[in-house]
Amino acid sequence: MCAVKATLVVRHRITYGEELFSEVVVWVVPQPIAGCTHAYKYRLALVAHGECVLRYDNEAGKGDHRHAGSGEGKYRFSTLDILFADFE
């Protein structure tokens, strides 16, 4: 039996300055991540001075969620385009 692997959709890092960058990584997965109903595994992060100040991700078990500063809350995923717009 052959395992189906995830397919990379995008991996992009933008440096805005010496201490500021954003990183976007999205995969299409063969089955939804635990806690999600869609076929994506993603991480979108904004990092300033070595600290993540904003992140959208869907780690297994937690499902779709958003980190802003020290806070964390649920995120309602609908499409990649809306996710990207929300991250902007």
What do the predicted segments below correspond to?
Residues 66-70:
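A short small-residue
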Residues 71-88:
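Short, compact, well-ordered microdomains
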